[in-house]
Amino acid sequence: MKNAAARNRTLITVGLDLGDRRHTYYVLDEAGKMAKEGSLANTREQLATMARSYPGATVVMEAGMHSPWVSRFLQELGLRVIVANPRKTRAIYENERKSDRRDAMMLARLARMDPTLLHPLEHVSQEAQQDMLQLKLRDSLVRA
């Protein structure tokens, strides 16, 4: 199964700047040129539509509030997902002309050039995430 997934990979790279209500995306084609950019609602339906448009693509996003569920969802849809460590992506967080579009573009370009520059992270499973939340809630109740 893994070999079949690897064969279906394309050189399409999607930078995805995650937001609470909307996500901004920037797509690089096989030649590394901008193919499309825009935004989509923070819904499974919109993410699934994007995934169907770029089967086998690599999607890169920074770790944040929505990255655990978004990354898992896109992986389930067959995309390769890279979650960048936001503390290590200097080119993005130190940029004077910061914008969602620019962040999405930089994520796509960095992933295309050398994904190790993003210092990729792996999120824990959904079950482990829920267990940690229960422990935090328990600790809060004990302190109260």
Regions found by a protein language model. Name each.
Residues 1-144:
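Phosphate- and other anionic-substrate recognition elements at nucleic-acid/protein interfaces
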